[in-house]
Amino acid sequence: MQDIQLDTLLSEDVTPENASQVMQALSQSLNEHNIRYYVDDAPSITDSEYDRLMQRLLKLEALYPHLIVADSPTQRVGGLALAKFDQITHLKPMLSLDNAFDEADFSAFHKRVTDKVGEVSFCCEPKLDGLAVSILYRHGVLERAATRGDGSVGEDITENVKTIKSIPLKLRGNDFPELVEVRGEAFMPKAAFEALNDRARAKDEKLFVNPRNAAAGSLRQLDSKITAARSLAFYAYALGVVEPDSHPLAKTHFEQLQQLKSWGLPISSEIKVCAELSQVYDYYKDILTRRSDLAFEIDGVVMKVNDIAQQQRLGFVAKSPRWAIAYKFPAQEEMTLLEGVDFQVGRTGAVTPVARLKPVFVGGVTVSNATLHNADEIARLGIKVGDTVIIRRAGDVIPQIVAIVPERRPETATDIVFPHNCPVCGSLVERLEGEAVARCSGGLFCEAQRKEAIKHFASRKALDIDGMGDKVVEQLIDKELVQSPADLFKLTASMMTMLDRMGMKSATNLAAAIEAAKTTTLARFLYALGIREVGEATAANLAAHFASLDALRVATVEQLTEVEDVGAVVAQHVAHFFAQPHNLEVIDALIAAGVHWPAIEAPSADAQPLKGQTWVLTGTLNQLNRNDAKAQLQALGAKVAGSVSKNTDCLVAGEAAGSKLAKAQELGVKVMDEDELLALLAANA
């Protein structure tokens, strides 16, 4: 914009006739100074002068509220807090990146790229440890912003994004497209993170563990005033959707980033184009060396093929572009003291040793505990309580003990002894031959496994108790209304009104759903029991093979291995489960409570025309539930797999079928649409 004299903006007389013009001039000036400060790093007025301009605009907007424009800098902080975040479907999927963890990984990626498109140069930039954000501008004005979410659907965080001062509410200049989507990373600089935790510490509030969590939590505040106080920052790293698509854009990724900067969007000052592979490695090493000195947390660098035409030729796989990769930094390591070991019991009964550590800051977070995995890992490390240990954050996420420092072992160091009995229920802890993990044999009886076991029992693919969500299960157990799956069927509507936010109508509906769930199938019942490594398909195969629960309960490991897709390990799990008295008591209680299923007739060869065939489902089915389609195909003898291969007999492609359809066509696999599937199922009903 052409500069307007500061004195003029501060002193011009304002009347109802010229108020709109003056307010627009003030907004335009303040937005330009924001860009000069946050993007160009070249402020042209002092902070006090900026504040005087802002105060004048605020006073005028108070006098003439009907003249407030959408891109006014005063509109960065919204009014009332939101009740919830709306969902936004991305105009173009926001994909994640594949990772390289060493030179061999990156070299393999480089070879894949050059084999397809020849020599390339890379646009390299730090991999910010924040939250991916999509920002949509229409006619240059910020219209909406969303999180990445699952890549297809994110959450509407428009009001919160507006509070980030480095993000322009209106783009600079006039050479931008009519509609442009900007993608980038919202993050919390280290200094802002430290200040945030200092304030929390002074108020005796819970501290954030790292800047990434702080940034994510700040962007997901329903009240944008809280976000505004968190001092978030943003760097743009890519263009998304551009309309019209004929709008002239730069031909390289680096030049497109410069276009974004010219429109007033901040980009990292560490971006560099590397024409040679040696330059890429030098860039990686340079950023790694300077990592701790940067103003923000990073966990690697991102390498993108610079030429846009080459990017388009390389294309995408299901979840990531073929032309970019995140080259991750090695995990950071620190030394600390092993003060003790606790043993935790998970849903499947796994007894896991957890190291209690003297707190140490490593990889951007304070670590006070780490998993020791199992007895084999303890033996491999030769670790004892009292040892000095080396902690690494693998992939900068999971803390783990990688070694001990033998020369620092005190005379008082003690062995780590695995418990013979479950620390929760007292049942025997057993370790099956060939397994590294020790497990509580209490199954559904063990209190530690109870919540997760009952959540699984009631879940959609198990007994499918409509309305029995995780929070309801947790309340039922916490209030001691339920101690085993069979107790679910003793619940009454009046009992369930004791739960939070559960009125009589909801309780009556849930009671009806519980009653309806008594009628199930043997396959669903077996899956609901939560037997280790027995998923839907295995449960269905067991039900079809044995036809009755009584036959399955007494089956030997040898008999179990005769079942399709059941190997020796799964057979051991099943036999072991039915050998535990506590588990049999729970099953008998469920039968006594009225859980039942229709008798299974052994299928004839004529009833299984798809026996021996492998089918795959992909895309959206409009007339048939995906699980129902899978079950009906299995009933006809088909094996339903999750991926397409040369062994696939048929792919059922619903709407928006993606990479699986392309692969099936490439391999010459038969493809069937939903109508053809329905016709097949109807013909064999």
UniProtKB/Swiss-Prot annotation:
InterPro entries (alphabetical): BRCT_dom, BRCT_dom_sf, DisA/LigA_HHH, DNA_ligase, DNA_ligase_AS, DNA_ligase_CS, DNAligase_adenylation, DNAligase_N
Enzyme Commission designation: 6.5.1.2
Binding-site list for Zn(2+): 422, 425, 440, 446
Keywords carried by this UniProt record: DNA damage, DNA repair, DNA replication, Ligase, Magnesium, Manganese, Metal-binding, NAD, Zinc
Gene Ontology CC annotations of this record: cytosol
Any one Gene Ontology molecular-function term assigned to this protein's record: metal ion binding
GO BP annotations, alphabetical order: DNA repair; DNA replication
Binding site for NAD(+): 47-51, 96-97, 125, 148, 185, 304, 328
Leader sequence residues: none
SUPFAM superfamilies: BRCT domain, DNA ligase/mRNA capping enzyme, catalytic domain, Nucleic acid-binding proteins, RuvA domain 2-like
Family, similarity comment: Belongs to the NAD-dependent DNA ligase family. LigA subfamily.
HAMAP family with a match to the protein in the record: DNA_ligase_A
Protein name in UniProt: DNA ligase
